[in-house]
Amino acid sequence: MISMNISSNFDQNISRFHEILDVQKNFDIVYHTLTIADKKACLYFIDGFTKDEILLRLMQDFASVKPDSFPSSAHDFAKQYVHYGETTVETDDKNIFTQLLSGLSCLLIDGYDRAILIDCRTYPARGVSEPEKDKVLRGSRDGFVETMIFNTALIRRRIRDCLLYTSPSPRDRTRS
């Protein structure tokens, strides 16, 4: 991945994020397009790492922003309208992707040449263990026994790489 800074061109930033994160292949990388005070915005996060209640509150707060009181910088926007969790304003997309894959949410807003990183994460609280019903005779005895979202979050917690693709598809057992 070539490191470059975020630009103030929203569409260019979004196409770069979609290309690097490959949101079409990764079912656990979620993005929501929003409108904040007549400006286009996009919120990226990893499903299974974020607290839904905080994201809902953030989106409600974003809906209340008026065009005439819209801040001129990403720093000011973060101070005035992001009241939940810690925030960081970042320009280098390599750092942004590392933080995003570590569980932070990333907000891109049209006209800002910086991304707002919001820490509203929660980590899965279980290690990988042997499944009770599907014992194997040989090989690894590690298994995933929760939902696919939870299991993927357990993997992403350890492997923070844009090249880790996750796409749900049935394999050898049922194909259904």
Where are these regions (language model features)?
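N-terminal pre-transmembrane cytosolic regions of membrane proteins
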Residues: 1-115, 122-133, 137
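Active-site phosphate-binding and catalytic loops of NTP-dependent enzymes
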Residues: 26, 163-164
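Noncatalytic linker/hinge segments flanking ATPase motor cores
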Residues: 82-90, 145-154
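Glycine- and Gly-Pro-enriched alpha-helical subdomains that act as flexible
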Residues: 129, 133-138, 142-146, 150-153, ...
